[in-house]
C-alpha cells in the first residue's frame, strides 16, 4: 500500500472499483477490508476524506483525484457529521475547521473555479455534505454565520469589477444545498414518518433557529434568483444562443434551469417558514409569470410549488384567505383552456396543473367539512370557491390523455364524500338535498366518468387480458399487460368508485344516465354490430358496472338476484325489502327497474354478434354477471346460449378467449341451470368441444416434461370447466332418469374407452410420456363430470340410477392407476378423481378404495400421503359406519407407510414442514375414526398387531411433538381412555395397565420438560388437553385412579403429600377449565419444589 493515509485510500478505492481487472484476489480483499475499516472509524477518518475531496493539482486548476476516491472521502465526512460528531471530544473544533475549509473550498471552486465542471452528481453529493454541516452548526455552535456566509457566495464574483448580479455556479449549488437542508429537516412527510423522537426534536429546533435567523434572507435570495432568471429569459434572442463571458454569469441558456431549481426550493420551504415570506403581492406576480414562462420545467416546478403553498398547514380561515389571495381560479382556467388539445407537447404541464387543482380542491374540501375549526361563513365560502375550481378539475378529467385525469381523482373522491355528508345534513334540516350548481357538477361528472371509461381505439388489445391472454399456445402465457393497459384498468377502477359515490348521493341519476348511454349507443346504428368496437365495449362495461355500483350503495347482502332487476313495492313508511328473498314467480310479476330495463335492452339487442374479440368477451362477462336475470326472464336464454356455443364462444379460435369462456360458460350454467329446459340439454352437451388432446410442452433436457405440463393452469385445466358443466346440466334431469343415464353414458363411455386404449398403448410404448399425460387428462375429465352433480345425500330414499354407471369409470381409473402408478401426475389425478367421485356417488364406490390404496401406497411421496390421509379423514367423517370395512382393510397398510416416513431423518426446513404435515394428518385420521365410532378398526383382527405401535406413537408425540401435534396426540389418548379404560365388555386387555404405565405419566412429564414454556399460548393449550386427559382418567377408572395417583404415582415422583391430596380433590371437583388453571399452578409449585 502507498505511504500517506490519502494515498492509501485512493489506491484502495482504485483496486476495489476495478476488482475484476486485478489478478491478486488477496489484494482486492485487503483493499475492501481497509475501506470498510475507514467507514467504521469515521471519527478519525473524516479528515482524510475531506482532504481528498478538497485536494487540488499543483497548479490549482483541477481536483487532484478521480471522482471515485473523492466521493468515498465525502461519504466518510457525511457519516461523521450525521452520526459520530457528537461523540468526539473536539467536536466544536472539528465543526469550525470544516466550516472554514468548506467556505474556502466554495470560494475557490464555485467563485473562482469551474464548479466541479458542472457534473450534477458531484454537486448533489457536495450539497448533501454541506446541508449536514449546516444542521450540525445549530447543534454545536452558538454562531450561525455559516449559512449566511455560504449564501453570500451567490452574489460573489471572481473579479471585483463584475456587477453584483448572481453567480450562477454558486447559486445553483446553494439551491441544491437548501433543498437537501429542507429534506434533512423533515419537509418531506414520508421521511419524517420513519424518524425517531430524538431526531424529530432536533429537526424542530433547527427549523426554529433557521426561521429566526435566516428564513427572510433565504426567501429574499430564492425570489431574487427566480425574478432575475425570468428577466433574463425575456431578453430578445433568449433561445439559448446568448453566450456568457464567464460561467458564473446568468444567461438565457442557464436562467431556466436555475429558476426551476430555485422554484422547487421555494416549495420545499413553503411548508415550514412564515407564509408572508412566500406569498406577497410581488411574489404572486412572480408565480404568475413563471407559470407562463417559455421554459417548461420552470412551469412544472411553479405548479408544484403552488401545490406546496396551498397545502401548508394553516387555520381554515387563514387557508381560505391564502387561496383567495393567490387568485388562481382565473389563471388556471386560462391555462387549462390554452393547453387543451395540444397533444403530448402540453400533457406534462397539464399533469402538473391538474395536480395543483387537486390540491386546491382538497384543501377547500377540508375547510368545508371542518365543523370544529371553521365558522359557518368560512365553510360556506369554501363550498362556493370549491365549485369554481371543480370546473377545471372536470376539464382535466376529460383530457384525452390519462395522466392529467389521474391527478384530479383524489379530490373528486373527497368532493363526493363531502357532498354525501352535505346531502344528509340538508335533509335532516328539511333543506334541498343539493344546490343547483352542485347537482350540475355531479351530472357533468357522471357524463365525463362514463366517457373516460372508453378505450382508445388504437390501444394494443391483442394477446392482452382484454381477450383472455395470448391467442395461441406458443405465446408466453405469463406475459403481463403493457403499462398503458394496466394504468387504464386502474383508471377504470377509480372511475367506477366515483360512479358509486355519486350513486350514494343520487342513485337514479347514475342508473338513468347509464340507461341513456346504453339506449343511445344501441340506437345510434341500425345494428349494434356496426358500432366502433370501443363504443360497443364501453356500453357493455357501463352496464356490467351498474349492478355492482347499485348493489354496493343499497347494502345488498344477498348479491345480485331476481330482486335486483324489478321494482319492489314498499310498505308505507318502510324501505323496499331488497334483502328478503321472495319466490321467483313473485319477481316475475313485477315490472323491471332501471337496471332491469338496461339488461333487457342489452340482451335483446344483437350486440353479442359484434365481430371484435374485446366486445365479444365483455358481452360474455356481462351475461355471466347478470346470469340471474336469465332465470327471471327465461326468454333471454336462447340468445346467450347460442352465443356461447358458436364461433363467438366456446368454438372461438383465440386460445386466450377460449380459456376464459370455458370458465364463464361454467359460471353461466351453474347459475341458470334451473331455467334451462331439459329438452335442450342433449343439444347443449353435443355442442361442447370436449375432445381431450394432451400436448407435451417443449422443455430443456434437464426438466421433467410431465411436471412442466401440469405445474400451472393450462388449456386443459380450463376445458375441465366444460366437463363440470356437463355434470351440472345432467344433474338437472333427475326427473327423467332414463334420459339422465343415457346422456351420462353417452358422455363418459367414449372417454372410458379412450382411457382403456391409451393404457394399452402405453403397455407397448412405456417411454411415451404423451400417453401418460393423456391418461392424466382423461382421469380428470371423467371425474370432473361427477363434480357437477350434487353431493351424495345419505337421507335420500333411493339411489340415483346414474351412480351405477360410475362403477365402470372407477374400475377403469383403477386399472390406469395400477399400470402407471410410478408417475406422480397419474397418482395425483387418481386421488383427486376418487375424492370427487366419492363426494357425488357416496357408498357405491367405497368398496374400490382398498384397491386404490394398494395401487398408491408404495409409490406415494410424503406429501401425497398427507393428501391421502386427509381424504380418508373426510370420507370417514361423512360416511362413518359405511366405511368400516374399507378402513379395516386399509388402516394397517396406511399406518405402515406413515411410520416409514415418520422414522426418516430430517435434513432441512422443507423436511420439517412436511413431517409436521404428516404428523397432523396421521392424528387427524385417528381422530376421524374415533369420532365416527370406528375405534374397533384399531383392534380388529387385521390391525391389532399394530395397536401397540399406534398407542406408543401417541405417547411419543404427546411428549416430543410440536405443540399442535402434542395436543392432537393427547386428545386421542383421552378419547381412547374414555372408550377402552372403563370396566366394560369393550375394555381392551392390557390397556388398563398401559394407562397407568404410559398415559398417566404424560400429565406430569410433558409440562416439566425444560422446553415447556408455561407463558406460551400454545403451551397453555397443551395444558388444557392434559387437564382433559386427567378428567377422562378419573371418569373411566374412578376412585381406583385417584388412589393410584395419590398413593403410588405421585409419591414415586417425590410429590409432597399435601400437594397430592390437593390435586386429587381438584380432579374430582373441578371442570376442565379451572382444573387446567390449577394444573398450571401445581406444575409451577412442583418445579419450585424441585
From Swiss-Prot:
Keywords: Cytoplasm, Nucleus, RNA-binding, Transport, tRNA processing, tRNA-binding
Keyword Nucleus attributed: yes
CC terms in the record's Gene Ontology section: cytoplasm; nuclear matrix; nuclear pore
The organism's place on the tree of life at top rank: Eukaryota
A Pfam family hit: Xpo1
Listed GO MF terms: small GTPase binding; tRNA binding
Main subcellular location of this protein, as a coarse class: nucleus
Protein localization: Nucleus; Cytoplasm
GO biological process, one term: tRNA re-export from nucleus
PANTHER family associated with the record: EXPORTIN-T, EXPORTIN-T/LOS1
Entry function: tRNA nucleus export receptor which facilitates tRNA translocation across the nuclear pore complex. Involved in pre-tRNA splicing, probably by affecting the interaction of pre-tRNA with splicing endonuclease.
Protein family (similarity comment): Belongs to the exportin family.
Identification of the protein by name: Exportin-T
